[in-house]
Amino acid sequence: VHWTAEEKQLITGLWGKVNVADCGAEALARLLIVYPWTQRFFASFGNLSSPTAILGNPMVRAHGKKVLTSFGEAVKNLDNIKNTFAQLSELHCDKLHVDPENFRLLGDILIIVLAAHFGKDFTPECQAALQKLVRVVAHALARKYH
């Protein structure tokens, strides 16, 4: 993947302002609420019976932070995303059996969360760069699937 200097600047500039805990919790909670079939991968998280339960679930919050912290590794390694996510791809494919389509869904939700958090600072150019990034990350995570 080729990144322009402008794309790199837009991505790193915005990412530097992201509250990983809050945005991660919101993104994962939205995934579980908007696409309820994804909840089956999180059975060990306890009560996911309603949007209120999901939004208040500390395990959802903690895992959301973990997911976005990992996503931050993509931002730090824009030129080597495939290798950055090789182990996570293997884990999600071989052990967790996550449908790779869920990576794309989470990426789209992350864009919505960032747009909501950053308002007018989330310009169309910024959205384009981040949409490209979430596609590349989703592709890297799906790499180990046959």
Curated annotation (Swiss-Prot):
Per the UniProt record, the source organism is Ara ararauna (Blue-and-yellow macaw)
Q: How does this protein assemble?
A: Heterotetramer of two alpha chains and two beta chains.
CDD domains, per database record: Hb-beta-like
Tissues expressing this chain = Red blood cells.
Q: Which InterPro entries match?
A: Globin, Globin-like_sf, Globin/Proto, Hemoglobin_b, Hemoglobin_oxygen_transport
| Function of the molecule | Involved in oxygen transport from the lung to the various peripheral tissues.
Protein name per its UniProtKB record: Hemoglobin subunit beta
Residue positions binding heme b: H63, H92
Swiss-Prot/TrEMBL GO biological process terms: hydrogen peroxide catabolic process
Gene3D superfamilies annotated for this entry?
Answer: Globins
Give the molecular function GO annotations.
haptoglobin binding; heme binding; metal ion binding; organic acid binding; oxygen binding; oxygen carrier activity; peroxidase activity
Q: Which UniProt keywords apply?
A: Heme, Iron, Metal-binding, Oxygen transport, Transport
- Outline the extent of the Globin domain: 2-146
- The UniProt gene name for this protein comes to HBB
Q: Which family does it belong to?
A: Belongs to the globin family.
Kindly list the GO CC terms recorded for this protein. blood microparticle; haptoglobin-hemoglobin complex; hemoglobin complex
